[in-house]
Amino acid sequence: MVNKTSTNNNKEPRRMKKHYLKSNASNLKKTLHKIKVRGFEKLPVSVLSGFLGSGKTTLLNYILNSNHGLKIAVIVNDMSEVNIDSKLILENEFKITRTKATEKQVEAVVEMSNGCICCTMREDLLVEVTKLAKEKRFDYLIIESSGISEPLPIAETFTFEIDGSIENLKDYTKLDTMVTVVDCSTWLEQYQSGESLKDKDMQATDQDERSLVDLLLDQVEFSNVILLNKCDLVSEERVKTIEGLIKHINPEARLLRSTNSVVPLKEILNTGLFDFKKASEHPGWLKELRGTHVPETIEYGIKSFIYKARRPFNSERLSNVIEKGSAVFGGVLRSKGFSWIASTPELIGMWNLAGVQMTILNYGYWLADLKPHEYPNLDLQKEIKKNWSEPFGDRRQELVFIGGNTMNQSLIESELNNCLLTDAELLLGKDIWRTWIDPIQLDEELEEEELEEEEEEGEYKDEIEMKVDGSKFKK
């Protein structure tokens, strides 16, 4: 990385901004899509996400102080950082700011003053968005999430019922664009740090056990537009590395480079890019497994390969390989897929390596181990049947590896091959396999308290982490 000292030369960016906005403000206004529903218009929404310090608020201020000609409503977490001259009014635990329509076209700002915009705030967020949409005075709504928020729960808010009625928020609004801002000067280091939010004293609650890398991945994977910000503070090589990795993580996203969060507004407002089903069902790693391969990005210094096998791993041997850390997986930036462990032969192991964090989760049952009446929906059956091969059915190893030029494919494949059952072990059968030492333990039960919490969220997946010392992966 090349360290540079940031210079606040605002004159040139300001001239460039004015030049662009004068020529495009009218076009942006003309192209704003409004869909008639029950006699009123749906309110388009953009959500801004990104880790702390990435430049979200700078982007928001840039939008609010631009001559776009739109009446914009805004929901933020920290009003103090939003540069709007207005009076605060306390209303129902929310601070409401109202300004005249002539003041940069900002009509209302709602500060979520009792917490961040995340899963615990979805009900309040739903109420506030509905209020703004029903006023029918705004052309657009922008939601700025907190730096430790994930985009998915915010997007899910737009499918929730309002006060138990038959009306959904989607009847009043149209989720238009999910924007994530990435700080190119710190993102790779944060990605590979192995730290948790608790380590950095940034957790949302005392029970927040999320890792930093998982948060960064969630913010990037569930976005339509990714703003690579602060490009002026790092080398071209660093920017290309980040671009290459993100292209593999989220190949559908629109990537934009920026300095001081300055970007053409047409790229983030009224794009029409968001599709909830598409965003939630087709992550980049799954596209690789399905053959929708991201082209080799040699120019970015990023490459990928898929490891496949049709026999199970020995749990103890696999654990020993994982413990070797960077001696085997050096250069790997991301790895995910499906694994088959002999000690728990009926269970799918969800393999997940990100940065220096390695986990294997219980992802449910192989279709080959289910009875016909237990089969999932027809579409999923068809997808699984594509990977069917006798005598093992859909049981398999299928792992995507994404990394830099130092990633050693032949070494990784050799080490993983040594973890596969030998012909003699394979003949012993499942009953014997189950008696072997099993450090991974996919069949371990969640603690009752964790189970209750996840069931309340409706997101229980019977997942168990196999935690590995992250320091072993550090370069």
Swiss-Prot record:
Residues that bind GTP: 50-57, 119-123, 229-232
Known catalytic reactions: GTP + H2O = GDP + phosphate + H(+)
Start-end of Acidic residues biased regions: 445-460
Highest taxon of the lineage: Eukaryota
Entry EC no(s): 3.6.5.-
Positions contributing to Zn(2+) binding: 116, 118-119
Pfam family, one: cobW
Keywords: Chaperone, Coiled coil, GTP-binding, Hydrolase, Metal-binding, Nucleotide-binding, Zinc
The keyword Chaperone is assigned to this record: yes
Main EC class the enzyme belongs to: hydrolase
Chain segments annotated as coiled-coil in the UniProt record: 440-467
Disordered as annotated region, ranges: 445-475
Domain (CobW C-terminal) ranges: 302-420
An annotated Gene Ontology molecular function: GTP binding
Placement of sequence motif CXCC motif: 116-119
Comp. bias regions, Basic and acidic residues: 461-475
Family, per entry: Belongs to the SIMIBI class G3E GTPase family. ZNG1 subfamily.
Reported function: Zinc chaperone that directly transfers zinc cofactor to target metalloproteins, thereby activating them. Zinc is transferred from the CXCC motif in the GTPase domain to the zinc binding site in target proteins in a process requiring GTP hydrolysis.
PANTHER family in the cross-refs: COBW DOMAIN-CONTAINING PROTEIN DDB_G0274527 (PTHR43603), ZINC-REGULATED GTPASE METALLOPROTEIN ACTIVATOR 1 (PTHR43603:SF1)
Protein name: Zinc-regulated GTPase metalloprotein activator 1
